[in-house]
Design a protein with these regions (language model features):
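Compact soluble domain cores
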Residues: 24-42
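Arg/Lys-rich, positively charged N-terminal/basic patches that mediate binding to nucleic acids
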Residues: 1-28
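Enriched for short, Lys/Arg-rich terminal
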Residues: 68, 73-113
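Basic/aromatic recognition patch in beta-strand/loop cores that engages polyanionic ligands
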Residues: 41-87
Length: 113
């Protein structure tokens, strides 16, 4: 499989905030990128080709339930190629979940990215 991983500006902003707060977060996210390159549709399907992925934040020592959530969108060009957009990332202890309207707004940002 040959999937490119891209981000949108709001994801980059949230990533920067979490990376400053949790020193291990960039390495935690690099593990996620590795997982996505092997299985683009990892996580829980939440509709519109979007998936919610639970990841641990090693420096929090709380496991997946107290870790972060990443919302992805998978656009398949064919069976072997596509693009994975990283739409949102949030700390589970700071934000309970993400609404359908927020996801729709994030999907609109793909077009302008």
């Amino acid at each position: 499989m040959n999937y490119k991983i891209k981000t949108i500006p709001s994801f980059d902003r949230d990533l920067k905030i979490l990376s400053k707060k949790y020193k291990s977060f960039k390495s935690d996210l690099s593990k996620l990128r590795e997982i996505l390159s092997n299985n683009p549709k990892s996580g829980i399907p939440i509709g519109n080709s979007c998936y919610k992925i639970r990841i641990t934040i090693a420096s929090k020592n709380k496991g997946k339930s107290g870790g972060a959530r990443v919302i992805t969108n998978v656009l398949s060009l064919n069976e072997l190629e596509g693009v994975i957009y990283l739409l949102a990332v949030y700390d589970k202890s700071e934000q309970e979940n993400i609404s359908d309207n927020e996801i729709k707004d994030l999907l609109k940002k793909i077009i302008t990215a």
